[in-house]
Amino acid sequence: MSFKVSCKIHILCFLLAYIFCYIQIDNISNVFVDLVTNYKIFRLTDIYFIDIIIAILVLTIPITLLHEIIHGIAYSLFGGKVKFGFKGIYAYTQEISGVILHRTKFVLILLSPVTFISLAMLLIQNSIGSVIFLLNLLGSTGDIIMAMYLVKSNSNSYIKDREYGFDII
């Protein structure tokens, strides 16, 4: 059985992120307005909307890199070798040594970035921490969907990472 990251999965990730943002729109708006009003580094123009877009772009790049590095560290802890890359606008970490991992280990690898970054942001209790938490959570929707898919599989199964997703063995 295989899990393939397809256009359908990307749309599902976008929809989940959209629903979350729609439900939390007031909180999210307050956090971003606080970010651009209280931190001079993010106040680049006199238009809040443009400042918010710039802040999102500036913060998304290092958050994404850290997210993928955490995946890589988790793979390494379980004996894998990784390569990092980009496919379109998406960054990815891929296990390249062919190691086959128990389902539980693979779920830990999938969820390690959202877990560690979220916990770290509890220590930064200001709007920057909130924005980093939010952007990482939204960027982790694919990992969460894959973990949910795996949790439904046999608990004794093994996973082989593939370029297109993963195989359940």
Task: Show where each model-derived region lies.
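Metalloprotease/metallohydrolase-associated module, dominated by Zn2+-dependent proteases
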Residues: 1-36, 89-169
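Perimembrane loop-to-helix junctions flanking transmembrane segments
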Residues: 32-50
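Short secondary-structure junctions
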Residues: 43-45, 81-82, 157-159
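Short pre-active-site segment immediately N-terminal to the catalytic Zn-binding motif
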Residues: 46-65
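Generic hydrophobic alpha-helical membrane-segment signal
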Residues: 55-56, 67, 101, 131
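Active-site recognition of the HExxH zinc-binding catalytic motif
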Residues: 63-76, 113
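Hydrophobic, membrane-facing alpha-helical anchors
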Residues: 65, 82-94
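Catalytic Zn2+-binding segment of zinc metalloproteases
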Residues: 71-83, 153
